[in-house]
């Protein structure tokens, strides 16, 4: 596989565009093929078997296009399908997971040998939070921290329907999920769905200034770079990169919204 081959990136819909955008920013020589499966969104309320089948269809499409790696820019699809995909294909398959370690590590202060327990909300889809993969992740950190799981399926739908700019709707939806918490005593919110990255500024309105809003995009893209470099597959520095957008929903509305989110 040539180092100039493209990277395939996919999501249940439009959220993974935030990951494609991060690749374009951090690895500008890379050519990205993005596929959003908006016709089948949301994945977060489907069964693991349904998500696996959809994920295999998309990766097969990428393989036919000659990609050198695939990024599953979807926490839900990662939870349901990443292990099976890695067993089936001989190209790197990079998954996502909620950046819980980053959130909990904020309790480790160099000047203090004792961990300061963190109060963390993980906002994600229902399926991500139900899957064994997330349970194992929680097991690593919940003994020294307080971790709240908050499924937020409506946040996916708001992005997919193009209503992200409706401030009243978004804040009303966020308050519906998060007013049950004493936000003044929350240390961070982990955005465990790539759709939710587009809500960062809204979460900032909800949280005290000292609290962090954390997503896994930068870490995922950094890992992608390390993997490609180890295989000698990074694109030449003088290559012209970019992002090509495709979607299972062929409507102009989705195409226009995809372009808009890529350039936010």
Swiss-Prot record:
Pathway: Cell wall biogenesis; peptidoglycan biosynthesis. SUPFAM superfamilies: Aspartate/glutamate racemase (SSF53681). Keywords: Cell shape, Cell wall biogenesis/degradation, Isomerase, Peptidoglycan synthesis. One of its GO terms (molecular function) is glutamate racemase activity. The active site is at 74 (proton donor/acceptor), 193 (proton donor/acceptor). InterPro entries: Asp/Glu/hydantoin_racemase, Asp/Glu_race, Asp/Glu_racemase_AS_1, Glu_race. It is an enzyme of class 5 (isomerase). Pfam families: Asp_Glu_race. The keyword Cell wall biogenesis/degradation applies. The keyword Cell wall biogenesis/degradation applies. Its EC number is 5.1.1.3. Signal peptide: none annotated. Substrate binds at residues 11-12, 43-44, 75-76, 194-195. Gene3D superfamilies: 3.40.50.1860. It catalyses: L-glutamate = D-glutamate. Provides the (R)-glutamate required for cell wall biosynthesis. Belongs to the aspartate/glutamate racemases family. This is Glutamate racemase.
């Amino acid at each position: 596989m040539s180092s100039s081959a493209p990277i395939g990136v996919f999501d249940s819909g439009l959220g993974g565009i935030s990951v494609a955008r991060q690749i374009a920013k951090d690895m500008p020589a890379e050519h990205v093929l993005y596929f959003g499966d908006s016709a089948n969104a949301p994945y977060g309320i489907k069964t693991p078997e349904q998500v696996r089948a959809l994920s295999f269809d998309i990766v097969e499409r990428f393989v036919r296009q000659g990609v050198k790696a695939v990024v599953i820019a979807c926490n839900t699809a990662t939870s349901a399908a990443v292990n099976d995909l890695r067993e089936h294909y001989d190209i790197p398959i990079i998954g996502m997971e909620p950046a819980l370690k980053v959130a909990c590590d904020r309790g480790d202060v160099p000047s203090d040998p004792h961990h300061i327990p963190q109060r963390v909300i993980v906002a994600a889809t229902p399926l991500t939070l139900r899957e064994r993969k997330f349970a194992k992740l929680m097991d690593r950190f919940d003994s020294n921290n307080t971790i709240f799981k908050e499924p937020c399926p409506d946040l996916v739908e708001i992005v997919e329907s193009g209503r992200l700019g409706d401030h009243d709707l978004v804040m009303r939806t966020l308050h519906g999920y998060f007013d049950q918490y004493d936000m003044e005593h929350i240390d961070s919110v982990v955005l465990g769905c790539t759709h939710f990255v587009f809500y960062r500024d809204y979460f900032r309105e909800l949280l005290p200034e000292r609290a962090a809003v954390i997503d896994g995009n930068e870490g995922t893209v950094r890992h992608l770079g390390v993997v490609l470099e180890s295989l000698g597959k990074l694109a030449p520095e003088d290559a012209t990169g970019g992002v090509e957008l495709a979607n299972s929903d062929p409507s102009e509305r989705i195409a226009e919204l995809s372009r808009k989110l890529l350039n936010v």
